[in-house]
C-alpha cells in the first residue's frame, strides 16, 4: 500500500511539474511572439519612412532638373541657336516642366543648407563594428574631448559588465566620437579597440564619428539666455551630435536610450528597462526616463526619432536639448487655453518616469572647458517606495492634510507616494478625468515598506458614470448607487482595494475614495492603477 501511495505521489508530482513547465513554455513563447510582432511592425513603419524619404529626395532632384531646364529655356529665348540642339519632343517636355510651379516640402537641407556642399556630409567618417540590427535596445553614448579626464572606458565597463550573456545579444552600444580631429579620433578608436576588442568583434559595441562637413559654421551664433558665446557653441554642437547619433541608431533596434560618457549603472538595468517598456506597450508614451538628470537615461521608440531629429534641427541653435524635448511634448498635447497644471498632466502621459534611477552621473569635469559639475541623481540609491502605472489624465484633489510635500498629484503621475495625516469620516480623494474613460479595473495600494501600518481603513471606492440616467444596469449594481450619483463598487481590505468595473457603468467621469469612519493612523497611498479598457 505504501508503494502504491508513493507511486501515485510520484506520478502526481511528475504531472504537476510537466503542466508547470508546459505553462511556462507557452507563456514564454507568447511573450517572445509579442516582441517579434512589435519588431515586425516597427520595421514596417521604418520601411515606409524610408520610402517617403526617398520619394522626397526624388522630388527634390526632379525640382533641380526643372530649374536647369528653366535656365536652358531662358538661354534659348536670348539666342535661337541652342533650340536647334533639342528635338521637338524634348522642347515639349521642357515647356510642360517649366510651366508648372509645384510647392516644395522643406527638408533637413532647409535648416542645414551646408550639407548640400558635400555628398558625404551625413556619412560617418569612422565606422567600426559589425553593423548589428534587430535588437531590442540601442544605447547611444556621445563623447568629446575633455581637458582634464575622460570617463568613457569606465562608463563602457559599467554598461557591459552589468549585462547577462543573453542580454549582450539583444542590444548594441554605439559610441559617437563628436570630434573632427583625425588624430584624436584615431586615438580614441585605438584605445577602445584595445580595451573592448571582444565586444566590438561580437557586434555589441560600435564606434562612429561624423565628417567635418556635417557641422555648419559655429563661430557667429547668437548669444541667448545669458549664456556665453562658448557655452552657446557647446550646446549647439551638442544638439547636432545627438541628431547624428540618433539618425545612425534608428534602424538598429526597437528602442533607443540616450546615455552619456560619464555614468555608472545599476545591476539588472537592461532587463528592468526592457520589461518596463513592454509593460507600457499599449500606452502612447514618447519618453521613458530612467534618470532625472538632463538627457541621461531618456528612452524613445525608434520611429519617434524621426520627429525628434527634425524638431531639433529646426531649433538646434536656439535652446539646449532637454528644453527642446519639453517643447515637443508641449506642442503635441498642451492646450494654450488650459492652465499649466493641465499641461503637466497631459505631458505626464507621454513622459513617464521610472524610479529609482538606473543611471548615476559620476563625471566631475564637464566637456565644456573649465566647467565643474557636481551633479548626482538623488534617486539612484533610493529604494522603490511606490509602484508606477500610467493612469488616464485627471485632475486630482483631496480633503486630507498632506504631510511634507508627498502630494496626491505626484503619486498619480508616478513621482512619489501620497502621505496624509490621520483621515476622518467624510474625507475623500478624488480623481476627475479630463475626459470620460472606459475603465476595466482599479487598484489602490496603501502603506509602504518603510511605513506598513499607514494604510487606508474603512474607505470605499466609488465611480461617477458619465450618464446619470438611462443606464442599462443590473439590480445589484443599481443598489450601489449613492445620492450624489456615484456608485460604490469596492472597499479597502488590509490596505488594498482592487476590482473590476461593471462595463455598464462606462464611460467613467471620476473615481472617489471616501473615508466612512475616523482612522487611528496616518495614510500612505503608494500605488494607483486605473486601467483603461484596451481596444
From Swiss-Prot:
Modification comment: N-glycosylated.
Pathway(s) served: Protein modification; protein glycosylation
Stored Pfam families: MGAT4_cons, MGAT4A_C
Enzyme Commission numbers on file: 2.4.1.145
pH influence on activity: Optimum pH is 7.3.
Carbohydrate-modified residues: 77, 458
Any one Gene Ontology BP term: N-glycan processing
Transmembrane residue ranges: 7-27
Topology Lumenal: residue spans: 28-535
Cytoplasmic compartment segments: 1-6
The keyword Glycosyltransferase appears for this protein: yes
Tissue expression: Highly expressed in small intestine, kidney, lung and spleen. Weakly expressed in brain, heart and liver.
Cofactors named for this entry: a divalent metal cation
Gene Ontology CC terms: endoplasmic reticulum; endoplasmic reticulum-Golgi intermediate compartment; extracellular region; Golgi membrane; Golgi stack; peroxisome
Keyword Nucleotidyltransferase tagged: no
Residue numbers of Phosphoserine PTMs: 474
Subcellular location per the Swiss-Prot or TrEMBL entry: Golgi apparatus membrane
Swiss-Prot/TrEMBL catalytic activity: N(4)-{beta-D-GlcNAc-(1->2)-alpha-D-Man-(1->3)-[beta-D-GlcNAc-(1->2)-alpha-D-Man-(1->6)]-beta-D-Man-(1->4)-beta-D-GlcNAc-(1->4)-beta-D-GlcNAc}-L-asparaginyl-[protein] + UDP-N-acetyl-alpha-D-glucosamine = N(4)-{beta-D-GlcNAc-(1->2)-[beta-D-GlcNAc-(1->4)]-alpha-D-Man-(1->3)-[beta-D-GlcNAc-(1->2)-alpha-D-Man-(1->6)]-beta-D-Man-(1->4)-beta-D-GlcNAc-(1->4)-beta-D-GlcNAc}-L-asparaginyl-[protein] + UDP + H(+); an N(4)-{beta-D-GlcNAc-(1->2)-alpha-D-Man-(1->3)-[alpha-D-Man-(1->6)]-beta-D-Man-(1->4)-beta-D-GlcNAc-(1->4)-beta-D-GlcNAc}-L-asparaginyl-[protein] + UDP-N-acetyl-alpha-D-glucosamine = an N(4)-{beta-D-GlcNAc-(1->2)-[beta-D-GlcNAc-(1->4)]-alpha-D-Man-(1->3)-[alpha-D-Man-(1->6)]-beta-D-Man-(1->4)-beta-D-GlcNAc-(1->4)-beta-D-GlcNAc}-L-asparaginyl-[protein] + UDP + H(+); an N(4)-{beta-D-GlcNAc-(1->2)-alpha-D-Man-(1->3)-[beta-D-GlcNAc-(1->2)-[beta-D-GlcNAc-(1->6)]-alpha-D-Man-(1->6)]-beta-D-Man-(1->4)-beta-D-GlcNAc-(1->4)-beta-D-GlcNAc}-L-asparaginyl-[protein] + UDP-N-acetyl-alpha-D-glucosamine = an N(4)-{beta-D-GlcNAc-(1->2)-[beta-D-GlcNAc-(1->4)]-alpha-D-Man-(1->3)-[beta-D-GlcNAc-(1->2)-[beta-D-GlcNAc-(1->6)]-alpha-D-Man-(1->6)]-beta-D-Man-(1->4)-beta-D-GlcNAc-(1->4)-beta-D-GlcNAc}-L-asparaginyl-[protein] + UDP + H(+); an N(4)-{beta-D-GlcNAc-(1->2)-alpha-D-Man-(1->3)-[beta-D-GlcNAc-(1->2)-alpha-D-Man-(1->6)]-beta-D-Man-(1->4)-beta-D-GlcNAc-(1->4)-[alpha-L-Fuc-(1->6)]-beta-D-GlcNAc}-L-asparaginyl-[protein] + UDP-N-acetyl-alpha-D-glucosamine = N(4)-{beta-D-GlcNAc-(1->2)-[beta-D-GlcNAc-(1->4)]-alpha-D-Man-(1->3)-[beta-D-GlcNAc-(1->2)-alpha-D-Man-(1->6)]-beta-D-Man-(1->4)-beta-D-GlcNAc-(1->4)-[alpha-L-Fuc-(1->6)]-beta-D-GlcNAc}-asparaginyl-[protein] + UDP + H(+)
Coiled coil stretches, renumbered: 31-57
Modulation of this protein's activity: Inhibited by UDP.
Keyword set, alphabetical order: Coiled coil, Glycoprotein, Glycosyltransferase, Golgi apparatus, Membrane, Metal-binding, Phosphoprotein, Secreted, Signal-anchor, Transferase, Transmembrane, Transmembrane helix
Molecular function as annotated in GO: acetylglucosaminyltransferase activity; alanine-glyoxylate transaminase activity; alpha-1,3-mannosylglycoprotein 4-beta-N-acetylglucosaminyltransferase activity; metal ion binding; protein homodimerization activity
Bilayer disposition of the protein: Single-pass type II membrane protein
Family: Belongs to the glycosyltransferase 54 family.
Function, in words: Glycosyltransferase that catalyze the transfer of GlcNAc from UDP-GlcNAc to the GlcNAcbeta1-2Manalpha1-3 arm of the core structure of N-linked glycans through a beta1-4 linkage and participates in the production of tri- and tetra-antennary N-linked sugar chains. Involved in glucose transport by mediating SLC2A2/GLUT2 glycosylation, thereby controlling cell-surface expression of SLC2A2 in pancreatic beta cells.
Full protein name: Alpha-1,3-mannosyl-glycoprotein 4-beta-N-acetylglucosaminyltransferase A
Amino acid at each position: 500500500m505504501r508503494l502504491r501511495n508513493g507511486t501515485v505521489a510520484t506520478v502526481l508530482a511528475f504531472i504537476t511539474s510537466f503542466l508547470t513547465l508546459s505553462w511556462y513554455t507557452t507563456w514564454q513563447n507568447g511573450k517572445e511572439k509579442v516582441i517579434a510582432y512589435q519588431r515586425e511592425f516597427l520595421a514596417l513603419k521604418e520601411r515606409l519612412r524610408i520610402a517617403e524619404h526617398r520619394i522626397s529626395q526624388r522630388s527634390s532632384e526632379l525640382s533641380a532638373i526643372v530649374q536647369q531646364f528653366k535656365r536652358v529655356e531662358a538661354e534659348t529665348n536670348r539666342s535661337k541657336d541652342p533650340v536647334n540642339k533639342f528635338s521637338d519632343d524634348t522642347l515639349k517636355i521642357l515647356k510642360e516642366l517649366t510651366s508648372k510651379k509645384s510647392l516644395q516640402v522643406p527638408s533637413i537641407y532647409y535648416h542645414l543648407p551646408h550639407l548640400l556642399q558635400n555628398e558625404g556630409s551625413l556619412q560617418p567618417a569612422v565606422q567600426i563594428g559589425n553593423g548589428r540590427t534587430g535588437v531590442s535596445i540601442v544605447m547611444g553614448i556621445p563623447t568629446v574631448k575633455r581637458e582634464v579626464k575622460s570617463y568613457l572606458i569606465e562608463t563602457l565597463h559599467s554598461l557591459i559588465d552589468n549585462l547577462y550573456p543573453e542580454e549582450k545579444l539583444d542590444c548594441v552600444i554605439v559610441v559617437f566620437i563628436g570630434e573632427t580631429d583625425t588624430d584624436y579620433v584615431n586615438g580614441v578608436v585605438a584605445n577602445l579597440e584595445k580595451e573592448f576588442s571582444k565586444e566590438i568583434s561580437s557586434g555589441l559595441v560600435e564606434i562612429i564619428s561624423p565628417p567635418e562637413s556635417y557641422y555648419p559654421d559655429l563661430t557667429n551664433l547668437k548669444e541667448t539666455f545669458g549664456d556665453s558665446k562658448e557655452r552657446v557653441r557647446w550646446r549647439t554642437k551638442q544638439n547636432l551630435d545627438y541628431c547624428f547619433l540618433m539618425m545612425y541608431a534608428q534602424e538598429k533596434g526597437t528602442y533607443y536610450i540616450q546615455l552619456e560618457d560619464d555614468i555608472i549603472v545599476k545591476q539588472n538595468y537592461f532587463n528592468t528597462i526592457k520589461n518596463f517598456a513592454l509593460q507600457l506597450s499599449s500606452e502612447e508614451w514618447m519618453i521613458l526616463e530612467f534618470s532625472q538628470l538632463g538627457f541621461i537615461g531618456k528612452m524613445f521608440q525608434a520611429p519617434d526619432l524621426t520627429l525628434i531629429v527634425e524638431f531639433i534641427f529646426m531649433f538646434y541653435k536656439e535652446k539646449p536639448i532637454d528644453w527642446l524635448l519639453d517643447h515637443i511634448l508641449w506642442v503635441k498635447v498642451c492646450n494654450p487655453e488650459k492652465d499649466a497644471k493641465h499641461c503637466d498632466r497631459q505631458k505626464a502621459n507621454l513622459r513617464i518616469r521610472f524610479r529609482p534611477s538606473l543611471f548615476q552621473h559620476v563625471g566631475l569635469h564637464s566637456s565644456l572647458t573649465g566647467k565643474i559639475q557636481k551633479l548626482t541623481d538623488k534617486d539612484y540609491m533610493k529604494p522603490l517606495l511606490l509602484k508606477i502605472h500610467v493612469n488616464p489624465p485627471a485632475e486630482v484633489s483631496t480633503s486630507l492634510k498632506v504631510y511634507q510635500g508627498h502630494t496626491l498629484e505626484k503619486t498619480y503621475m508616478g513621482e512619489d507616494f501620497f502621505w496624509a495625516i490621520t483621515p476622518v469620516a467624510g474625507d475623500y480623494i478624488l480623481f476627475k478625468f479630463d475626459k470620460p474613460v472606459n475603465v476595466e479595473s482599479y487598484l489602490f495600494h496603501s502603506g509602504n515598506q518603510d511605513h506598513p501600518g499607514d494604510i487606508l481603513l474603512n474607505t470605499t471606492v466609488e465611480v461617477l458614470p458619465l450618464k446619470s440616467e438611462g443606464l442599462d444596469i443590473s439590480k445589484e449594481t443599481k443598489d450601489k448607487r449613492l445620492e450624489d450619483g456615484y456608485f460604490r463598487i469596492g472597499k479597502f481590505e488590509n490596505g488594498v482595494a482592487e476590482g473590476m468595473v461593471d462595463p455598464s457603468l462606462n464611460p467613467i467621469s471620476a473615481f472617489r475614495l471616501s473615508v466612512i469612519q475616523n482612522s487611528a493612523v496616518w495614510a500612505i497611498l503608494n500605488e494607483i492603477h486605473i486601467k483603461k479598457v484596451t481596444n
